[in-house]
Structure formats: structure tokens, C-alpha cells
Amino acid sequence: MAAAVRQDLAQLMNSSGSHKDLAGKYRQILEKAIQLSGAEQLEALKAFVEAMVNENVSLVISRQLLTDFCTHLPNLPDSTAKEIYHFTLEKIQPRVISFEEQVASVRQHLASIYEKEEDWRNAAQVLVGIPLETGQKQYNVDYKLETYLKIARLYLEDDDPVQAEAYINRASLLQNESTNEQLQIHYKVCYARVLDYRRKFIEAAQRYNELSYKTIVHESERLEALKHALHCTILASAGQQRSRMLATLFKDERCQQLAAYGILEKMYLDRIIRGNQLQEFAAMLMPHQKATTADGSSILDRAVIEHNLLSASKLYNNITFEELGALLEIPAAKAEKIASQMITEGRMNGFIDQIDGIVHFETREALPTWDKQIQSLCFQVNNLLEKISQTAPEWTAQAMEAQMAQ
């Protein structure tokens, strides 16, 4: 039967007629090829592709028929469809500029098959082949944004955050132009995941936390985003940014539902955390979050050591390296190195006396900090009063009169 299809195609290519008539006849041959099965179907469809890319067939007809051809292929068995997709891409390549739309469709379908097979890298690379910026066809913003996000997500699934970041950066140039709220959410999720994989934990936590307030997102997914925000905050390097994020999460009542709330509470209250208290939390982490740092310790170990060091700085005026090492459950030399790094980076106040082997902690004066906080609060209260008086001047006047009368 495949031979009959090939013969029909050869005869039709040498015949003349209107585009409409010829397209109708090619469509009948395509339907006949689709009805076949097994090896016969495969050979017939390959013959059809070869005919469509032949220069003797009008471009108007071949584009139209290849578009129809693409709509039929997802209904075929994945193994057959995959072979046909690869064959089509190979045959179209010399005339790819003439069939950009059809090639994009083929690549999207082929990527879906690879994704079902969990072959993430091949799925991503197939989509990368779509010339979104360099081709003749002008793709709309949403299509480009969705494709870049899909590529980034596939590279993340393949544990390649470097490539994922490259494509999320391309998506970031487009996301402000899109009005599709669902795509905006997908962008934020993907960007948060890229930051998470790249170990930029505090930035990832901020993105996840922002997502946890989006009402368009389902409640269970909002809680999942909040969980990721909490995990990333715990893994982040100790410092002011992390302290602010800990405060934000601790004040969020939803966090009390999360399994890691106990660790959050200890960190927010500047309590020393012991290694045996971390086992349950460590089991909740994703594989990339369990990676080791340059000194051989895990990301979690490093984060907790830094937290404990910061907590110790609020308990002691000074402490020897030996005592600090015992407190942090690490060698004295490692304790000195981490303390030195944190002081140098401005994440902890103090100085090191290497001759006596002592680290001295400095506390900031409390009064100026309180003054600034009170000043900020008064400023915000004034702003609120001004907005109330602008919105409801009559009510404000009555309230002030009542206050004066007391």
C-alpha cells in the first residue's frame, strides 16, 4: 500500500490543475496514508513528506498540507510519530525558511514526546531549534515567552541550571510585554526555581514568598510556594537580608502549618541549633539543596553554622576559637575561617585577635536603631492619616472634633 501512495504522489506532482483541486487530492492521499498501520504507514508518510518538500509542488499547497500533516501525527503511536518528526525535520532542513511555521509545530510535538519519556535534555534541545528571534516568521510575545519558559523548565528537570538561567533571562525580556496572567505566574515560578537551583537562596525565597500571596494560584500551590520560601530562607547565608526574611515568615501564620516551622522559630529567636535537630528537615530538601560546598560540608550545615555563629555573637562579647568551635560543633580553625569571612562580608560585626585566638563581637547601639524604627512608624501613621482625610474629609473632621472635645 505504501508503494501505491508513492505512485499516486508521483502522478499528482506531474499533473496540473487549480491549487484547490490539487490540495484536495493531496489531502485524500494523506488520509489514505494515515489509515495504514505499522511499517506501511511509516513508509507512506515518509513518501508524503518527500513530496511536500519537493520544489515541483507549489509552496502554497505544501505549506497547507504540511500543516494538516502535523495535526494528524499526535494521534499516531509515539514511536512512529517520533521517527516521522525526525525524518520531516531532516527533509525540510534545506528549505527550512519556507516552512518555519510547520517546523515550529513539528518541534513542539516532538518535544512533547521526549517530555513524556522524561528525556528532558532532548526535549529542550528540540525546542531550542525553533528560530524565535532570528527567523522570517514573527512569533507573538506569548508564544515566545511560553517556549522560553518551557525550555528553562526542561533544563531544570535535567539538572542544568546554567542553561535554564540563560533561557529564563530571555523570558524576562518579554514578560513585561505579556498580558497573560497565567504566563506571568509560570515565569515567576520558573525564575524562583532557577534562583533556587543556582543557590541564590534569599532571592529565591523572596520570589517564592511573593507567589504565595497570588490569589490566581490555587491555595495548595500557594502553601507549597511558602514551604519553598521557608526552606530557601533556612539555607541562605546568615545576614540582614535573611533576618528580614525570617521575620516576614515568622509573622506569617500560614507557616505554622509547615513541617519546618520549628527550625524557623529557633532561627528567628536566635537560638543555637544542634546537628541532631536537623535530620528531619534535611530529609525534606530537594536533591540540589543537599549538595556539598567547597569545604565538604552540606549547604544546610554551612547555613546552620553561620546562624549559630550569629546567635553566639548576641550571647557573648568575645570567645576563643576553641570554645567557639565546641559551641558550633566544628574544628576551631573552621570556626575562625567562617567568622572571618562573615565579618569581612559585613554579615557580622566584630574583629579577630589572632594572637590571643579570640573573636570579639560588636553590638550596634540600640538607641539609634529604635529612633529610626519609631521615626519610620510615625511617618507611616502620618501617611495613613493623610490618605484617610483625602478619602473621607467629613469623617476626619468629626473624629478630630470628638478627639478635641475629650
UniProtKB/Swiss-Prot annotation:
Residues that bear N6-acetyllysine: 25
Subcellular location: Cytoplasm; Nucleus; Cytoplasmic vesicle, Secretory vesicle, Synaptic vesicle
Cited SUPFAM superfamilies: Winged helix' DNA-binding domain (SSF46785)
Keywords: Acetylation, Cytoplasm, Cytoplasmic vesicle, Nucleus, Signalosome, Synapse
Matching InterPro entries: CSN4_HTH, PCI_dom, PSMD12-CSN4-like_N, PSMD12/CSN4, WH-like_DNA-bd_sf, WH_DNA-bd_sf
Superkingdom, taxonomy of origin: Eukaryota
Modified residues (N-acetylalanine): 2
PROSITE patterns assigned: PCI (PS50250)
Assembly and oligomerization: Component of the CSN complex, composed of COPS1/GPS1, COPS2, COPS3, COPS4, COPS5, COPS6, COPS7 (COPS7A or COPS7B), COPS8 and COPS9. In the complex, it probably interacts directly with COPS1, COPS2, COPS3, COPS5, COPS6, COPS7 (COPS7A or COPS7B) and COPS8. Interacts with TOR1A; the interaction is direct and associates TOR1A and SNAPIN with the CSN complex. Interacts with STON2; controls STON2 neddylation levels. Interacts with ERCC6.
Family listed: Belongs to the CSN4 family.
Protein name per its UniProtKB record: COP9 signalosome complex subunit 4
Organism encoding this protein: Pongo abelii
Gene for this chain: COPS4
